[in-house]
Amino acid sequence: MKVSIPVGLLILLTWVGAQAQVSSLPAPQVGYVMAQGSSAILVIDTRTNTIVHKLKHADLVRPAGGRFHPSLKRYYAGGTGKVTIWNTTDAAHPVYLKTVIPAPGNTGEYRGFLIYQGSTTAIDGQVWMANIQDSTVYVYRAADLEGADPTPVNVFAAVDGVRAPHFLMHRPGTPEVWLTNRPVNASGYLLRFHGETHTVITTPTEKLETMSITGDEPNEFSFSPDGALAYVGHHGAMLTGSPSDQMHVAIVDAATFTVKKRIPMIASATVPGYVDIDPEGGRVYVTTKWSPTVVVFDSKAERVLRYIDLGGFGPGYGVALTPDKTRLYIPLGTPAQSAVAVVDAKTLTVVANIVDTDLIGPRLVRFTSY
């Protein structure tokens, strides 16, 4: 016997089924591009490689650094003299929340950001911010930044060995926070802090020079998943005051705090300053600043697998792997491209080149996995 279904009920069931299908689709991955030249944050939808939202605010001045909180509810954006905090509950449509001024009157750039011990369920842990010009690192409680007039719980400065600080990372499985220091008129070095006690770690030594060359500028780095090794890029070049262009990535033994090996680049891949890692895939990705190139490094064999020429003069200003590990996004700054190149991590080919009238001087791409 046939059972007839009323038309109204049929329409309702069809609508519910369609909604269930839509809700089961993966959420779009979005990336934030810090466009320094236009003082903007541009939101990229990685499904289409298009810019879907543009953020501007009077306090967002020449942004070059930033970091998502693991809860994915906040994004801390560095700029000149100020840090803006954005509500990212809807990551594709962030909303300005507030401005923090760690040092009133200071016009230095807040470049390095780290969320220490932040959870995925609350806006907690610590937010570390490095000001490269005033050689200071500020440590706030994330919860305090939600209130009025927050003050840092600790400040690291020149007396603690901080000099032109740039990039911060938490070493996996330890309370160690590592910082690159990149003075242009001296050898750069790594410093380590204890994330709980807020003290400088001095054993076996306080500072580690990764190249011991004036103006070498250790820049961005990534840890192996077990925290045993750090892969350190170098930003120093003749244009920035170094006597020569840097041509090596240093591999640091994290336990002994010593340089294990230096990996040379080919002559056309100059100044390998930016690093990201695929912990499951066993690859380290490095972007060179001049004649921008993505260098694909096998972390197990400790050898270069591929050089991917991005074309143009440069500069390349970073490399960011999407959370699903399928694509790499590389900002290409002024004066040449002002674009974001997209590389397929499987085929190792350039699959897109993103441009926009507000994509001026991009300095960083951040995903929710950072």
What label would you give each PLM region?
Residues V7-G8, A18:
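Cleavable N-terminal signal peptides
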Residues L13, Q19-Y370:
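Predominantly soluble domains enriched in secretory-pathway, periplasmic, or organellar proteins
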Residues M1-V7:
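Bacterial N-terminal signal peptides that target proteins for export
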